[in-house]
């Protein structure tokens, strides 16, 4: 499957440009105002473009760049975005912080861990794409870019 097939499969708008890059290559190909997202975020994490409100606001508030995130983070945030859309719950990124702690795994990136063993999100997305963690897409175009495009230390006020 090429980039056009990938865009069709994940319902990425035609005005969004994707450029495939293996691990390491994106550092030299990324331009200003472009963002790098691991392909696994779409495949296992349910990442969508344009980003959902919860996903976008969580990344901005925590100053986390999309390529620093493990698929789990996108999976949880995307699940809440979907719940809001389908059930009109009105949850915000503050609710995510209340229920989850953000942790860093050196090789995987930032992930969310539930603060409570009694309450967890049920996540039904696939986890069968071993070897894809080193594949990235550079995203540009008109996709409502509202997240960091330059890597910074997480936390604090953006």
Which residue ranges define each predicted feature?
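Residue-register detector that marks a fixed positional context within folded domains
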Residues: 1-158
């Amino acid at each position: 499957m090429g980039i056009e097939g990938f865009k069709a499969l994940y319902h990425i708008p035609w005005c969004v440009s994707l450029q495939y890059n293996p691990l390491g290559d994106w550092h030299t190909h990324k331009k200003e105002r472009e963002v790098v997202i691991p392909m696994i975020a779409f495949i296992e994490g349910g990442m969508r473009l344009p980003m959902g409100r919860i996903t976008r606001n969580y990344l901005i508030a925590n100053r986390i760049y999309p390529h620093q995130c493990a698929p789990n983070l996108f999976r949880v945030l995307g699940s809440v975005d979907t719940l809001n859309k389908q059930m009109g719950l009105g949850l915000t990124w503050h609710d995510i912080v209340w229920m989850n702690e953000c942790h860093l795994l050196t090789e995987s990136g930032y992930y969310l861990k539930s603060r409570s063993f009694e309450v967890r999100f049920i996540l039904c997305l696939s986890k069968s794409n071993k070897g894809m963690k080193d594949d990235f897409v550079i995203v540009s175009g008109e996709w409502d870019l509202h997240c960091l495009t330059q890597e910074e230390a997480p936390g604090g006020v953006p």
